[in-house]
Curated annotation (Swiss-Prot):
It is an enzyme of class 1 (oxidoreductase). It comes from Agrobacterium fabrum (strain C58 / ATCC 33970) (Agrobacterium tumefaciens (strain C58)). Binds 1 FMN per subunit. The lineage of its organism: Bacteria, Pseudomonadati, Pseudomonadota, Alphaproteobacteria, Hyphomicrobiales. This is FMN-dependent NADH:quinone oxidoreductase. The gene is azoR. The keyword Flavoprotein applies.
């Protein structure tokens, strides 16, 4: 049995290319075994509140010192952490928005990157606790950011690899769907390449 966590984040909904291919990959992975499970969080349709003073205080306090409001905030964050830790495979879909990830995805990260739960500090440095997971990132972009002159503007993939690695998730595969603003032929080529890559990865899993 494999537990799959699908995180989609594009505010474009059904028109989103990253949502489409992340969903397709997660679906193909789930279909490999009847015992596989799939949990889907759509961060645009059901946004996770950004960190505020209540939530920040809640995750820093022992449970018996929290106010009622802080307990609710901590329980919500704990649920997200539990979903992540239970997953064997994580599929993340995001568009490249102003050279980085969607803010809703950042909010999810801020809730699951928790000291003592998904990482810990030691005398020799931080240690990730969310280990043993395969992560797939589907990144959609209007331009081309996987290579060429604009690669340095792609802050999304380096950031995601850094923060995921910090939590112990180092086996990361990136699927680019890019050049989507370069006309119909470019879109057709990008979509075909993404479809082939999704099929390849699903078969290899």
């Amino acid at each position: 049995m494999s537990n799959i966590l699908l995180i989609t984040s594009s505010p474009r909904g059904d028109e989103s290319v990253s949502n489409k291919f992340a969903g397709e990959l997660a679906g193909k992975l789930k279909a490999k075994s009847a015992s596989n499970t799939l949990v889907h969080r759509d961060l645009a349709a059901d946004p996770i509140p950004h960190l505020d003073t209540v939530k920040t205080a809640a995750i820093r306090k022992p449970a018996d010192q929290r106010t009622a409001e802080e307990s609710v905030a901590a329980d919500y964050s704990d649920k997200l952490v539990t979903e992540l830790l239970a997953a064997d495979t994580v599929v993340i879909g995001t568009g490249l928005i102003n050279f980085n990830i969607y803010s809703g995805l950042k909010s999810w990260i801020d809730n699951v990157a928790r000291a003592g739960q998904t990482f810990k500090y030691t005398e020799t440095g931080p240690v990730g606790l969310a280990t043993g997971k395969k992560v797939y990132i589907v990144l959609a972009a209007a331009g081309v950011y996987s290579e060429g002159p604009a690669v340095s503007m792609n802050h999304a993939v380096p950031y995601l690899k850094t923060v995921l690695g910090f939590m112990g998730m180092t086996d990361v595969e990136v699927i680019y769907v890019e050049g989507l603003a370069f006309g119909p032929e470019a879109v057709e080529k990008a979509v075909a390449a993404a479809e082939a890559k999704v099929e390849e990865l699903a078969q290899a899993a």
